[in-house]
Amino acid sequence: MVKIRLKRAGRKKMPFYQIVAADGRAPRDGKFLEVIGHYNPTAKPHAVTIEKDRVAYWLNVGAQPTATAHSLIRATGLLHEMNLKRRGVSEADIATEMEAWQQREAERRQKRLTAKTRRRQAKKAAEAAGSAEG
């Protein structure tokens, strides 16, 4: 069975992954059929680039993405777009829906970042209050 998965590259403690279509029996960093994208987890924010037409091709011929590959593909919006096409939605409606999806996704990302910043500030304030008392 063909799987869409990550192939590790980069150097020690600086991972960089290729998103590949590979035979499920092949080792993680072994033989693969095609490179269909890249993922850089060390970049801030994480950098994901995929060739949407090739990923769509492999998914349509039955390739199964691993959990991590699935979440990366989903984060790009490709699965949502493919689902709309499968339902028979017109290209114009797909374009408007994908723009709306991009807006919602940007808002979610911003909301997560602000929540993370608030938690960090609260933690610093608690540490400062704790050190002032002690």
UniProtKB/Swiss-Prot annotation:
Would you say which domain of life the source belongs to?
A: Bacteria
Q: Which GO terms describe its biological process?
A: translation
Q: What are the GO MF terms of this UniProt record?
A: structural constituent of ribosome
Please verify whether the record's keywords include S-adenosyl-L-methionine. no
State the GO CC annotations: cytoplasm; small ribosomal subunit
| Keywords from the UniProt entry | Ribonucleoprotein, Ribosomal protein
Q: Where is the composition biased (Basic residues)?
A: 109-123
Q: Where is this region: Disordered?
A: 105-134
Name any one Pfam family assigned in the record: Ribosomal_S16
Family of the protein in this entry: Belongs to the bacterial ribosomal protein bS16 family.
Recorded hits in HAMAP family, A to Z, give: Ribosomal_bS16
The protein depicted here goes by the name Small ribosomal subunit protein bS16
Biological source species: Chlorobaculum parvum (strain DSM 263 / NCIMB 8327) (Chlorobium vibrioforme subsp. thiosulfatophilum)
Native organism taxonomy:
Bacteria, Pseudomonadati, Chlorobiota, Chlorobiia, Chlorobiales
| Gene transcribed to yield this protein | rpsP
